[in-house]
């Protein structure tokens, strides 16, 4: 597998997660349970953002691949691998902050408000998924070798 195939798989997986998140949010948004409503709002917002990132990332990847000349393929792939690995590790660190922020929200505003507890839980779940997603892909990218 080359870096371009890897990026296609990565963005496709993120898009699937985003569709799942938005679909799940529509099922729980109109719940009488405030906690579920807060969770639904977070799943919807994160799902939309993740979809945007996945679509944009896929488009950028295709454009970069089309610009690469066969004579520069190995060098371009090496640069892309290095760049994407760095982005994934940075995102993994940011995901920890999202999780901590969600926990903080649950333990502050969420103590007295089920809606805010749902918001916090939604951030923890979404941040947790992204942590494992980014970590897995950052670790997996090390197996890719430029052509």
Name each region found by the language model.
Residues 61-66, 108-111, 135-147:
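Cytosolic juxtamembrane helix at the C-terminal end of the final transmembrane segment
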Residues 34-52:
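Loop-to-helix transition at the N-terminal end of transmembrane alpha-helices
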Residues 55-80:
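Membrane-helix interface/capping segments
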Residues 10-18, 87-96:
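Select subsegments of transmembrane alpha-helices in polytopic membrane proteins
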Residues 96, 113-138:
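Alpha-helical membrane-associated segments of multi-pass integral membrane proteins
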Residues 2-9, 31-38, 72-89, 111-118:
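Juxtamembrane loop-transmembrane helix junctions in multi-pass integral membrane proteins
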Residues 93-112:
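Alpha-helical transmembrane segments and their membrane-interface junctions
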Residues 1-18, 147:
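Cytosolic-side membrane-entry/anchor segment at the start of a transmembrane helix
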């Amino acid at each position: 597998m080359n870096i371009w195939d890897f990026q296609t798989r990565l963005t496709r997986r993120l898009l699937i997660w985003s569709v799942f998140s938005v679909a799940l949010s529509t099922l729980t948004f109109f719940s009488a349970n405030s906690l579920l409503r807060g969770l639904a709002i977070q799943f919807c917002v994160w799902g939309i953002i993740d979809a945007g990132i996945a679509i944009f990332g896929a488009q950028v990847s295709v454009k970069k691949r089309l610009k690469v000349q066969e004579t520069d393929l190995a060098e371009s792939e090496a640069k892309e691998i290095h760049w994407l690995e760095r982005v994934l590790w940075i995102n993994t660190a940011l995901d920890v902050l999202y999780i901590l922020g969600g926990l903080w929200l649950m333990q502050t505003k969420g103590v007295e408000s089920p809606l805010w507890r749902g918001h916090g839980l939604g951030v923890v779940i979404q941040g947790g998924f992204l942590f494992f997603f980014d970590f897995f892909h950052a670790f997996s990218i090390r197996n890719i070798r430029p052509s």
